[in-house]
């Protein structure tokens, strides 16, 4: 019954998008943006961190959109300071890399002009609009398979064969690294046979394009859904969250394959001594894995304005704390935006922090639609509004400068990061 309900809602979402008309589709296109260059200058060796911080999946005292309106626009020197970054390696050593920003006109970043002022509190309340993806075909195939679980309790998303994007607060509290960051692991869902072998033959990727989510999940063949319903037991299948690579007793069910993290990179803007009021804008980090995965990853894109997103809608999947072992998908509308943040109406719970938020737009001059990551889900935050603390679900947008920085972390140079 739950699976039928999900299919109905996803079908309704698809039809609502298709009903907007072809003329409007012309606005829903990925545009090629010229990206500023971030050039590394000096590298300094730092002493090893203490790893004393406790993981904190909900932040308090955040300076959000309203609070940031009162702040001056950062200068180019400020931005270079914020975008300098720290790298922490698996052996506990760390470095600070200073950067220079080139080809970036002043005054184009961190302009916090709020839009879409309709506001309401949102974590999980009333009717829960989240969907647990229990079908093995869907949860281990793109785009759902890009969602990963961190051993620190957060979520993340695959952005290259060896890199994961997540929230900075999942590994660092702004003062020190969390206590399990030194031995941080990333869990990727895979289907294991009874012998712990390879993917079952029946679990194949779709041919000739991207598989399903809310916009296209309903297009899956009836045969696959019928088989799924027949095979599913009365109780939802549980995903084992035990440490290490699971063997033997998995019985063909999805389970996590855990991979150690080789290094963690965090912008200096996240550290409290650098940007006390604007640290939320830099709540993102990239994890480099010790070994590459074989899953399809999702590309990054500069976040467009909300009006250029179909239905002002965003999507993301993660591993919510209140649904232990389940991959949880949701889609919702954005309520308010600035150049660096947006508030959204997605139901969520601690554990989903760090998820990659994506949208689906057309490729230029093509009929093909493609999903790309445009923000990182920071989580349910208590933000300052008119001198008081109010709670909202907050996402950190991928701006041109953040795109340039994350791209540099992935490729190790800025030659491959000129357009986004």
PLM features: what roles do these ranges have?
Residues 43, 50-56, 63-64, 72-155:
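N-terminal activation segment of mature serine protease catalytic domains
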Residues 200-226, 232, 294-298, 374-420:
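C-terminal cap/linker of serine protease catalytic domains
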